Curated annotation (Swiss-Prot):
InterPro entries (alphabetical): Adenylosuccin_syn_GTP-bd, Adenylosuccin_syn_Lys_AS, Adenylosuccinate_synth_dom1, Adenylosuccinate_synth_dom2, Adenylosuccinate_synth_dom3, Adenylosuccinate_synthetase, P-loop_NTPase
UniProt name for this protein: Adenylosuccinate synthetase
Organism: Acinetobacter baylyi (strain ATCC 33305 / BD413 / ADP1)
Annotated compartments: Cytoplasm
Annotated positions binding Mg(2+): 14, 41
Lineage: Bacteria, Pseudomonadati, Pseudomonadota, Gammaproteobacteria, Moraxellales
GO molecular function, one term: magnesium ion binding
Presence of the UniProt keyword Metal-binding in the record: yes
Length: 439
């Protein structure tokens, strides 16, 4: 029987999920995206060639792997069609390998306009969204006014009525509250009619396909976007995304019940990063634009190429935080960890790990909001670094002694086994200690 494996991020996103999903799909029959939208950026490097995906599952480069977009994803037809075109130019038969749930809510031009107008109005208090309409699209989903893929495929008067109702509200907000131009109904309808021709042949009952595969004993990979600390419920609210990025989102976003999930792999950087606003207790402040700030922060950002795959924004960098990782392990019921970018720490004289916090407000214990995080002072444990290169190593026996000690200490602190170690961006630059599909 094939196993069903979940791959998700345990930090604030950008942990290296795309590479690992791509690597592990050699044993999968299908790969599923179950939440988020095109705010994700998953980078794959195969044979030295770089591919960045935002919506399409990372298994798309594999032959004989079905790629599915589940109902929990908010789907931008414009972004998807653009991404399909780029891949098709590279010879990837996307239309043969990709299928979409009819229940995905659509991201339309009015959602993007709202998202960007809100961020602008917030000024210095902005959340740091990608401005791509993700949040407003999820709002419409919860408010039961979303236009979904099924509506797009049906077209006709029913689609027009839904668009009119949505735009009436959104345009009132845009013009009367935010003071920007309205989005024209005719323009949105014309786009929908264009998109229908491309997307209609790809629509399928994703949940049924998943259960058919399960009954046939085929292995399935569930690919998460963003990271657990950006979860709408468990993240540093309000500096979060609008979906459930933790393991619970798999079932609601795909229709695969939790008892059918066999293994949950948490992708975790060997240090910590965050892009955009929000609290970050172990941050080492560095500004790439002016080349000023903490030297270690500069090292992590420069050597780790810490710029967002979706936005190009500089990622904030800091020491590994074992305290927040313990919470991710628990919330996601992780089976194992994949530790990425260990090679970025090469050459550092010493390395710190946050093992706890000072002055935790017991009255807010368990709260994951931004206010609770802002006052936290990390308690660090210092470990010796290593001068040897770990780039491209494929066996744990090859690791320098201090690097191995660092890996083992993380395992002890987070109480979860490290099953995979990534030592570079390419598929081949990986140590697989325990394969999720055979665990």
């Amino acid at each position: 029987m094939g196993k069903n494996v979940v791959v998700l991020g345990t930090q604030w996103g950008d942990e290296g999920k795309g590479k690992i999903v791509d690597l592990l799909t050699d044993q999968a029959a299908a790969v599923v995206r179950y939440q988020g939208g095109h705010n994700a950026g998953h980078t794959l490097v195969v044979g030295g060639k770089k591919t960045v995906l935002h919506l399409i599952p990372s298994g798309i480069l594999r032959e004989n792997v079905l790629c599915l977009i589940g109902n929990g994803v908010v789907l931008s037809p414009a972004a998807l069609i653009k991404e399909m075109g780029i891949l098709e130019e590279e010879g990837v038969p996307v239309k043969e390998r990709l299928r979409i749930s009819p229940n995905c809510p659509l991201i339309l031009p009015n959602h993007i306009a709202l998202d960007q107008a809100r961020e602008k109005k917030r000024g210095n208090a902005k959340i740091g969204t990608t401005g791509r309409g993700i949040g407003p699209a999820y709002e419409d989903k919860v408010a039961r006014r979303a236009v979904r893929v099924a509506d797009l495929v049906r077209g006709g008067a029913a689609l027009e009525e839904k668009l009119q109702e949505m735009l009436e509200l959104h345009n009132f907000q845009l013009t009367q509250f935010y003071g920007v131009e309205a989005v024209k109904f005719e323009d949105v309808l014309a786009l929908c009619n264009e998109w229908r021709e491309v997307l209609a042949p790809l629509v399928i009952d994703v949940t049924k396909v998943l259960h058919d595969y399960r009954k046939e004993g085929k292995a399935i990979m569930f690919e998460g976007a963003q990271g657990s600390l950006l979860d709408i419920d468990h993240g540093t609210y309000p500096y979060v995304t609008s979906s459930n990025t933790t393991a619970g989102g798999v079932s609601s976003g795909s229709g695969m019940g939790p008892l059918h999930l066999d293994y949950v792999l948490g992708i975790t950087k060997a240090y910590t990063t965050r892009v955009g606003a929000g609290p970050f207790p172990t941050e080492l402040h560095y500004d790439a634009a002016t080349d000023t700030g903490d030297a270690i922060g500069r090292h992590l950002g420069t050597v780790g190429h810490e710029f967002g795959a979706s936005t190009g924004r500089q990622r904030r960098c800091g020491w590994f935080d074992a305290e927040i990782l313990r919470r991710s392990v628990e919330v996601n019921s992780l089976s194992g960890i994949c530790l990425t970018k260990l090679d970025v720490l090469d050459g550092l004289d010493e390395i710190k790990i946050c093992v706890g916090y000072e002055d935790v407000d017991s009255g807010c214990a368990g709260s994951s909001d931004a206010v609770s995080f802002e006052s936290l002072k990390p308690i660090y444990e210092t470990m010796p670094g290593w001068s040897e290169s770990t780039v491209g190593l494929t066996s744990i026996d090859q690791l320098p002694a201090n690097a191995l000690a660092y890996v083992k200490r993380i395992e002890q602190l987070i109480e979860c086994p490290i099953d995979i170690i990534s030592t570079g961006p390419d598929r081949a630059e990986t140590m697989i200690l325990r394969h999720p599909f055979s665990a």
